[in-house]
């Protein structure tokens, strides 16, 4: 069974209605429990270095995410970073420089609708990210 590190950073995927808009509110554990189809498929460890709207993601946060990956690198077969979509591409680019040459897959995922929305894409996005990260033969050299 693959051991995967799920890194929760916030974003729409972790958001709930608060006041006059969405705000990151759900923990990584709550997000994983929202997708019962993953139970028993992976040995899943969850860390949450931050829970922010991705418009507030800064270079120091990229360094923290990279540090979390490095800290868990030897113990895990792959990594899924749950992230807001506004700045996901910037974080992915930063991580590609901060963690070069990794034979272990690192996938970033998010959603357009929060996990609690009945029309959310969050559940399938998280599920497919975990499926993809477990297929190491898809990793590019």
Per-segment meaning from a language model:
Residues 82-104:
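Short Gly/Thr/Asp-enriched flexible loops that form oxyanion-binding sites at enzyme active sites
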Residues 75-77:
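Short acidic/histidine-rich motifs immediately flanking catalytic phosphotransfer sites
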Residues 52, 85-87, 110-115:
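Acidic, glycine-rich active-site loops and adjacent beta-strand->loop/helix elements
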Residues 136-141:
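Conserved small/polar residues in nucleotide/adenosyl-binding loops
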Residues 122-133:
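Active-site glycine-rich loop that binds ribose-phosphate moieties when present
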Residues 15, 87-92, 125-126:
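Short glycine/serine/threonine-rich phosphate/pyrophosphate-binding segments
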Residues 2-73:
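N-terminal glycine-rich anion-binding loop in soluble enzyme alpha/beta folds
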